[in-house]
Regions:
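Small/polar residue-rich beta-strand/coil "junction" motifs that cap repeat-based extracellular fibers
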Residues: 1-10, 17-41, 45-109, 115-280
Length: 280
């Protein structure tokens, strides 16, 4: 027994100064440490291990719950089989895991694997440094942020906000339920829209871009090929470098500008007179 320590139970050991061990085969070896439960093991000074097979492995660590483990300095593990394995890590919830320094995992089976990462929600996963995943089954990569049920920010520096939103490649942004930004640098904002070309922008519910640098602005707008631009509800720029301006406008051929469609034409008015030159 350590000085002024207490051990209660079969094969119980309280070796640290002023330590406390209660339960069969419980062990408290750190000074001022506490081990409560069968096979509980409190190693660090001022640490607390409570629950069958609960374990602390460093100073000021706290483990509460069956088979919980707080192995890093000042780490905290709360919940059955929760595991905070690095310094200052925190795992809250059954089978949660915070496996990097300063990582925080909150929720059943949540996992924060990167330094300074945060996973909040059932089965959420912050897989790399500075990742933030908030929402059931959300996922985030390095420096990425995913917020919402099943949201995924899989690319470096990507952002996915909304249930089922996906920012799949580096530097992408998907904002809105079921929105998808799946090419490098793409931006998708709105419900159920998709930006599928590099540096493409899809803004508006149900808008879609399918080409590099394409832009679709407006509900249900579509810019399908490289450098296409569609502005307005249901506007459709189908050709390469084409432009569709106004609700329902359709530009089917490459390098064309459309302000209407085959059944609804528009006039372009209030234009200044042009200049006449030898190249006009």
């Amino acid at each position: 027994l350590g000085e002024a320590s207490v051990a209660l139970g079969i094969n119980t050991t309280s070796a640290g100064e002023r330590s406390l061990a209660i339960g069969a085969s419980a062990t408290s070896t750190g000074g001022f440490s506490i081990a409560l439960g069968r096979y509980a093991n409190s190693v660090g000074e001022f640490s607390i291990a409570q629950g069958d097979h609960a374990e602390t492995g460093a100073d000021d660590a706290i483990a509460f719950g069956r088979e919980s483990k707080a192995l890093g300095i000042m780490s905290i593990a709360l919940g059955a089989t929760a595991n905070a394995s690095k310094e200052y890590a925190m795992a809250l919830g059954a089978s949660s895991a915070a496996s990097a320094a300063n990582a925080i995992a909150v929720g059943r089976n949540s996992a924060a694997a990167g330094v300074d990462s945060l996973a909040f929600g059932r089965l959420s996963a912050a897989n790399a440094a500075n990742a933030i995943a908030m929402g059931a089954e959300s996922k985030a990569a390095e420096n990425a942020t995913a917020v919402g049920t099943n949201a995924e920010a899989n690319g470096l520096n990507s952002i996915a906000l909304g249930s089922g939103s996906i920012a799949d490649v580096d530097n992408t942004i998907a904002l809105g339920n079921q929105s998808q930004a799946v090419a490098a640098g793409a931006i998708a904002i709105g419900q159920g829209n998709k930006a599928d070309g590099a540096n493409a922008i899809a803004l508006g519910n149900g808008s879609i871009t399918g080409g590099v640098n394409a832009i679709a602005l407006g509900q249900g707008s579509y810019a399908g090929l490289e450098n296409g631009t569609a502005i307005g509800a249901q506007a459709s720029a189908q050709g390469k470098n084409s432009v569709a301006l106004g609700a329902g406008s359709v530009a089917t051929d490459a390098d064309t500008v459309s302000v209407g469609n085959t059944t609804a034409q528009r006039q372009i008015v209030n234009m200044a007179a042009g200049d006449i030159s030898t190249t006009s």
